[in-house]
Amino acid sequence: MEASTSLLVLVLAAAAFAAGTVTEAAGDGCSAGCDLALASFYVTPNQNVTNMADLFGIGAANYRSLAPYNPNIPNLDFINVGGRVNVYFTCGCRSLPGSPGATYLAGAFPFQMSRGQIYTSVAANYNNLTTAEWLQATNSYPANNIPDTAVINATVNCSCGDASISPDYGLFLTYPLRAEDTLASVAATYGLSSQLDVVRRYNPGMESATGSGIVYIPVKDPNGSYLPLKSPGKGASAGAIAGGVVAGVVVLAAIFLYIIFYRRRKAKQATLLQSSEDSTQLGTISMDKVTPSTIVGPSPVAGITVDKSVEFSYEELSNATQGFSIGNKIGQGGFGAVYYAELRGEKAAIKKMDMQATHEFLAELKVLTHVHHLNLVRLIGYCIESSLFLVYEFIENGNLSQHLRGMGYEPLSWAARIQIALDSARGLEYIHEHTVPVYIHRDIKSANILIDKNYRAKVADFGLTKLTEVGGTSMPTGTRVVGTFGYMPPEYARYGDVSPKVDVYAFGVVLYELISAKEAIVRSTESSSDSKGLVYLFEEALNSPDPKEGLRTLIDPKLGEDYPIDSILKLTQLAKVCTQEDPKLRPSMRSVVVALMTLSSTSEFWDMNNLYENQGLVNLMSGR
């Protein structure tokens, strides 16, 4: 059996073990953790968000997944020294080394020590979220005898709430106090002055603390609501939330990091894809071609069948992009930069990804080597030398976000917008309904819908894609929340629940964008604190005494008067159905495609009676 398959078995076994044991009583301190906690990271000079994401096990390449928890930061690429960034993590119930009965709540993050490092220097990396004394207490290495190559647990304490204090709060921020802070001032910062007595009860003995120590503050989720406390399981300490699956993820992360570290030193060869124009299986080649510093352990593409995808050399990609020059750079995403190139007579877009983005690289490679559709961007090939590279067909007309809000683009006609919506819906319908397994994109937004020279749309950027078995409707709860703020439905942002209806919700937001050309989050001033979601704005218009007039205030001014208001009203109603809070009430992408076909057709001879499951949606679009 291939190494990758063995690793998968190990992962599944560990997950089953964690899920089965984590909710059992583990001692007097706690018996279970919770899916989600936040840490307030104080920004000092020479720090950036990628560093913070790396310290908390999120991965530097995934730093943009912090955006939903930081609505007051307009751009995570520019953070102010002296400010604070909220970082999410799993709050687990853990035991002190050698004392399984002594338990505590904390996030634990594998930290690779280097020569000369001590617990004090590790604590300094976390900016008072932990201490040298606490690191020594939660690790097995003596402070004066830490091996140079040791991987320790960097532990950050957290809270899951307490039912005896309040059932209204289930999400907490670990906040390290600074000289200017008191418990009362921090509570006021988070709008909890009226609940100061409750905050005090969560932080006994901290009322007079200033300048040092940690306090736990109830905070709102990305949708602006307080998460209620989940009912603790039997044997759980007050306020503990059952989080078996997520705790399993923490265990797996540690296992995975250990495997990476071990194979970095021991790997002798790697399994790589064989270049071929035809469908091929993987072969093995000598490590003379790919060194451990380039690819660690087994090739990350092991086990993937590549259908007509070419393995390019680094030299060929470098030559085609003038050494990945600024002049060839055409974009920058959360997982890497994109460069224009001409390869073997074809225009191409090359995404250059950091080695730490292996998960996203694999996800995208796996989807696009198995799934082929007119409305999905086409993968030409890949490269795994020096960095991770994906080579796509070049779509020369930019993305939908640029056409709606960028400079130098001709306004999109209403007919073009409907066609773009239909093309995008067809791409999503294909991955939801016609692939085995079913794929869930998880990051549908206007920036990930590419427009070709004929103004036809293709869905792109599959780096966050999840998959599920045929007939499955959702992924396990506790999935790490990634994606883009403003496009995430409530069940995903709050609980990590993943199903195809996550994409349906995001697509509904894109429909609102097509109507209004506004961003998913609309800021009425330069201050990001004064903002509203596009979903809210349209619901407000639809609930007004005259919905058509309400909508006119939101319609893209670039359309002028060149639009049928009835068509806009119907598309708005479709978007509203897609963005319903209850995922069960949202239509499938199959029904959305039918509705858009009806809306885009001028024919009176559509036979809608035999099409798909949502006849009411069809009737809505056809005006019946």
UniProtKB/Swiss-Prot annotation:
Residues carrying a glycan: N48, N128, N153, N157, N223
Main location: membrane
The UniProt record lists the keyword Disulfide bond: yes
An annotated GO BP: innate immune response
PROSITE patterns found in the cross-reference section: PROTEIN_KINASE_ATP, PROTEIN_KINASE_DOM, PROTEIN_KINASE_ST
Classification via Pfam families: LysM_RLK, PK_Tyr_Ser-Thr
Function: Lysin motif (LysM) receptor kinase required as a cell surface receptor for chitin elicitor (chitooligosaccharides) signaling leading to innate immunity in response to biotic stresses. Involved in the resistance to pathogenic fungi, probably by sensing microbe-associated molecular patterns (MAMP) and pathogen-associated molecular patterns (PAMP). Involved in the detection of microbial peptidoglycans (PGNs) and mediates PGN response. Plays dual roles in PGN and chitin signaling during innate immunity.
Signal peptide positions (record): 1-18
Transmembrane annotation, as ranges: 241-261
UniProt protein name: Chitin elicitor receptor kinase 1
